[in-house]
């Protein structure tokens, strides 16, 4: 479990993380989202004990990390896959790290196979592609069989097979009861991997909860209704809290009520309905809506 309470980090007059409080529970994959500059990496560095908070506290499994007696068994973290010795092989990088924590060769061999590095374990890490470097970074993070795993953009540079491997790995770690916090800019992948979300904007917490709840409150979630009586049905459904959009065709887009309630109202009024389809905003759409005021640089219009 990760417990963050009142966490603040300032660099001079710039506040990177601002009074942040949230809990990451074990047994689920939690996505850590936010636009560039939101404070995600700074928060992860404070979780790892690499940056000292200006104020506030971080606890990992109830302890102030890295003061735990066996820190690699408490927290496995990947912040930068390039943080390896380029002149050493993948195996020797892992062996060197293992020695610092009293971890044996057998566990090194296990994480090499787990990360799919068996064929390149003897190759210099400096010659690895970004994707292979990510695999090595994940192997290092899992070396101590940690109860909590924090990964910053682990799918960067991975091919589709590697992305799927990360997805299944994170889910299996969560299924074992571990705490898993992962950041990514790939919303489609996060939608398939995470069940809980923590969303930052300009250093502040702007949302926390399930992926389902996050997307349910976004514009685009509702019911698509197809009927030749759009005007009459739209008038019938008009009520506080219900939005009806008529695009001039035989379709209505309705939010604030359910398909069952719409169908019942149409049946009682003897209005024909040809289609009732619940619609859901994608995670990307919901993310863009909730963070639009927290983006430092907006893209220009496309042609």
What are these regions (language model features)?
Residues 2-4, 9-182, 187-201:
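ABC transporter nucleotide-binding domains
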Residues 57, 222, 272-275:
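Residues at or immediately flanking beta-strands
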Residues 66, 85, 103, 188, ...:
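Short alpha-helical
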Residues 101, 218, 241, 280, ...:
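Conserved NTP-handling cores and scaffolds of large molecular machines
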Residues 110, 212-216, 299-300:
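Short, flexible cytosolic linker that couples an ABC transmembrane/permease module to its adjacent nucleotide-binding
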Residues 167-257:
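ABC transporter nucleotide-binding domain
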Residues 257-303:
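C-terminal coupling/interaction segments
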